[in-house]
Amino acid sequence: MDSLVENTLERLVNRVATSYFGKYRGVVTDVDDPNNQCRLRATVPAVLGEQECGWAMPASPFAGDGHGFVMLPKVGSGVWIEFEAGRLDNPIWSGGWWGSGERPDPQSATVRVIVSEKGHTFILDDESDEVKLVHGSGPEIKMTGSEIVLTCGACEIKITNENISLNNGLIKVGLAGVSLVNGAMTFGVPP
């Protein structure tokens, strides 16, 4: 009986000694997945030193045939690496982490933000009750409960429940007709 207990303990110790459970900080080294599955490679210093892990599968919020959540970090970004069933040959990347000062703006608990490397930004702002899509070079679309505003340089189109306004009211299109230059000329709809 003692040899059975010893044998079981020895196998258990060996299993624990060669298993890696939990999350480990990694740094992305390659995102050019030859299988096109959103896998990446990373260094995981706490486990592998400076050696890269194998191709890590994504732990995506959802994925299926031809649909899902697709966002890959760039090379040099911080990622969390796990190992399926604790095995080093089955890496998984399950998210990212920011170093000090790397978090994108805006920084609020009520604002959800997706920012690309080139600054293209999607903002869900519960604080201001608006949704905003901003191109990295400046043009933007802003939506609230009562209006949609498209801005590109000095040009602006504002759509409300009652009218469409171009360039801060220089042209207005509404149910009653069209007005130009703040009322200088009006084309109405016959009564």
Segments (PLM) and residue ranges:
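Short aromatic-glycine-enriched beta-strand elements
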Residues: 35-43
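Conserved structured core elements
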Residues: 18-22, 70-73
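Catalytic cores of peptidoglycan-degrading enzymes
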Residues: 43-49, 53, 76-80
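Right-handed beta-helix
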Residues: 1-13, 70-79, 83-191
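Beta-strand/loop nucleic-acid-binding surfaces
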Residues: 49-70
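Structural detector for short beta-strands of small beta-barrel domains
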Residues: 20-34
